[in-house]
């Protein structure tokens, strides 16, 4: 998505830039929300897959910081587009907001809750969210575009909830019998395919969107397979 949008920016094809950025932001929310829910639900099996000796603490960190996936993707995408547009000075504003919010929230949470490392994780989430939203707003204002609230937020959020419930049920069913590794891999494949199917079924994506969204070709193949 970044590469194709950057190509349109360099060629000064303004009529394509808005569509590319809108589809790119939509793609960020589509995949960011899915992996946020997936990480939150499967925090314990994933933590035990990485290091079983600190599985409980690592699981709490994954659960608390799961939304960082979404904000990191949004921050990266908006940063790259603004950089390609020659708006480096605006990046300083976004990252300045992120650092300031992180320091303030981490300090407050650490003193109030005395949660140790979890206060830093939560502060990082809040700070990154503030920076990502700030850069996203700046980018939309600069390019005079805005995300589609229905196709970019509402429908994916509903699909993520459905996949999250399925992942929760499968985790309770599989984890005690097949272990952490098999549970994590199998649930990732099953829930991701279901998520893509629901997005296609609900017409969340249009023809041009597949060009700018990671995995767009695979999603289009899945749609043709089920005639969606």
Question: Where are the model-predicted features located?
Answer:
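Alpha-helical transmembrane segments of multi-pass membrane transport and lipid-handling proteins
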Residues: 18-53, 59-73, 103-104, 108
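Membrane-interface helix-loop junctions in multi-pass transport and translocation proteins
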Residues: 56, 86-136, 165, 169-189
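Membrane-interface junctions at transmembrane-helix termini in multi-pass inner-membrane proteins
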Residues: 66-96
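Membrane-proximal transmembrane or re-entrant/amphipathic helices at the cytosolic face
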Residues: 168-228
């Amino acid at each position: 998505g970044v590469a194709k949008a950057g190509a349109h920016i360099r060629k000064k094809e303004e009529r394509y830039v808005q569509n590319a950025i809108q589809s790119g932001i939509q793609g960020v929310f589509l995949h960011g929300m899915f992996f946020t829910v997936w990480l939150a639900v499967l925090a314990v099996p994933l933590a035990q897959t990485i290091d079983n000796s600190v599985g409980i603490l690592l699981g709490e960190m994954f659960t608390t910081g799961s939304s960082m996936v979404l904000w990191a993707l949004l921050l990266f995408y908006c940063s790259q587009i603004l950089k390609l547009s020659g708006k480096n000075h605006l990046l300083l504003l976004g990252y300045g907001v992120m650092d300031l919010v992180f320091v303030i929230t981490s300090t407050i949470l650490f003193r109030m809750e005395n949660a140790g490392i979890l206060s830093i994780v939560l502060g990082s989430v809040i700070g990154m969210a503030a920076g990502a939203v700030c850069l996203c707003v700046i980018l939309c204002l600069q390019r005079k575009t805005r995300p589609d609230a229905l196709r970019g937020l509402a429908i994916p959020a509903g699909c993520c909830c459905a996949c999250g419930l399925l992942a929760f049920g499968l985790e309770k069913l599989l984890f005690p019998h097949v272990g952490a590794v098999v549970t994590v891999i199998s649930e990732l494949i099953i829930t991701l395919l279901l998520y893509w199917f629901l997005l296609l079924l609900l017409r969340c994506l249009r023809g041009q969107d597949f060009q700018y969204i990671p995995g767009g070709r695979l999603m289009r193949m899945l749609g043709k397979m089920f005639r969606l």
